[in-house]
A protein has these predicted regions:
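Post-signal-peptide N-terminal segment of Sec-exported extracytoplasmic proteins
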Residues: 33-71
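Bacterial signal peptide processing site
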Residues: 18-21
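C-terminal motif of bacterial Sec signal peptides marking the signal peptidase cleavage site
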Residues: 13-16
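Sec-dependent signal peptide recognition
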Residues: 2-10
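Compact alpha-helical subdomains of small soluble proteins
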Residues: 55-111
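Hydrophobic, lipid-facing residues on alpha-helical transmembrane segments of integral membrane proteins
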Residues: 9, 31-32
């Protein structure tokens, strides 16, 4: 009986940790997304926001967990140059470029 209670307690503890981590990840991603969107919009002011957002999504989808944390931290600290640098690194990768190409076609064909 004690073993069953121990397993149930462990399961509940791990479930709570996973849920907390999911919330933290979502908050970091949202902060990073806002930072990337702001950086791209400021670097390309003539591009409508609707066209910048798909690029931002591609950057966030292809950034590593460490890059998401760095982008989020840089955003909070107001380090726009760091956000631009990290965004450029992620944009230079082939999977991100493929994502951006698809997003561009979608944005142009489905305004």
């Amino acid at each position: 009986m004690k073993r069953i209670i121990s397993y149930i307690s462990l399961f509940l503890f791990l479930s709570a940790c996973a849920e907390t981590q999911g919330v933290a990840d979502a908050l970091a991603r949202q902060s990073a997304k806002t930072a990337v969107n702001t950086a791209l919009s400021s670097r390309f002011p003539n591009v409508p926001a609707g066209l910048v957002t798909p690029f931002t999504d591609c950057v966030i989808e292809n950034a590593s967990a460490a890059e998401i944390i760095s982008l989020s931290t840089a955003a909070v600290a107001g380090l726009e140059d760091e956000v631009v640098r990290l965004t450029g690194e992620v944009l230079s990768r082939a999977p991100t470029q493929t994502c951006v190409a698809r997003a561009s076609v979608d944005a142009l064909t489905n305004p």
